[in-house]
Amino acid sequence: DLGLALWAVPGVAALAAWAPIALRAPGRPAGGRHILPVDGLRRDGLAWAVTLFMGLQSALAYCVLGWMAPMLRDRGLDGTEAGLVTSLSILLQVAACLLTPVAAARCRDQRGLAVVLAAAATLALIGMILGPRWAIWPLAVIQGIGQGGLFALALMLIVLRSGDAHVAAHLSSMAQTTGYVLAASGPLLIGVLHDWAGNFRASTGLLAVLGVCTALAGWRAGRNALVRATVVQTPDAAAAEAS
């Protein structure tokens, strides 16, 4: 229960960091009420990279939320220590959610940051499964920072890759609906592999694939460019804007 409650904190922190960027986005609709349709978004490779980055980093996050404590129990930790390690990892996502937007804003593009965060989150989680027991606590710190940074960066990229608020709204919908459907497969596959192998070591291959794919999607989504989507000005929308 504590882990589930703590998971809401990074989201609030990321929203606080993301809101000023969204409010400064060019072409913000009058009063923020009317979002116009856009054309070409689902045909744009950059938009799909943002979507995949959102979904893949979420898959890693769901694996942490759902399976980190059982993974640690499998390593021989008792329930209390496994819960404390998991809580530490999730708590550190708060700091990462606050600091990542600052770091990302200072970068010419966010490709390198995306790769570093994906590597930190993935390798630390794999290390907690395969590495020595004494390394579990420091690896939990690294994992939390990497995972929280990925979440904040995924939200930031929606705004940074959008030319205006209309495109940002549709890109957000695309990234979060399609992305979260993809994300749901992560914990499910971890469970299937555990049932098949009888331990979590078999899941490290899946985690490695998720990490590499997250880094590749982040490298593509992090380049300094805008998605190619055109706002469609319909008569009804124009009348609504005028009102």
Residue ranges of predicted features:
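A late C-terminal transmembrane helix in Major Facilitator Superfamily
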Residues: 162-201, 206-207, 218
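Helix-loop-helix hairpin linking two adjacent transmembrane segments in secondary transporters
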Residues: 1-23
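Extracytoplasmic gate region of multi-pass secondary transporters
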Residues: 44-97
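Helix-to-loop junctions at the C-terminal end of transmembrane segments
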Residues: 96-109
